[in-house]
Amino acid sequence: ANFPTVSLNTVGITRQIPQDFMNAV
């Protein structure tokens, strides 16, 4: 999934989120 610039700052947190969920977003 492509991460917005803002998510890059919280990539440590987003890594814990399933990729399937990120794809839904």
UniProtKB/Swiss-Prot annotation:
Processing and modification events after translation: Glycosylated.
One function term, GO molecular function aspect: toxin activity
Record's keyword terms, sorted: Apoptosis, Disulfide bond, Glycoprotein, Hydrolase, Toxin
EC number(s) stated in the UniProt entry for this protein: 3.2.2.22
Catalytic activity from the UniProt record: Endohydrolysis of the N-glycosidic bond at one specific adenosine on the 28S rRNA
UniProt subunit comment: Disulfide-linked dimer of A and B chains.
Other noteworthy facts: The inhibitory concentration 50% (IC50) is 0.8 ng/ml for transformed cells and 10 ng/ml for normal cells.
Family under the similarity heading: Belongs to the ribosome-inactivating protein family. Type 2 RIP subfamily.
Function, as annotated: Toxic type II ribosome-inactivating protein (RIP). Induces apoptosis. Has cytotoxic activity against several human cancer cell lines. Is less cytotoxic to normal human cells.
Full protein name: Aralin A chain
Native source organism of the sequence: Aralia elata (Japanese angelica tree)
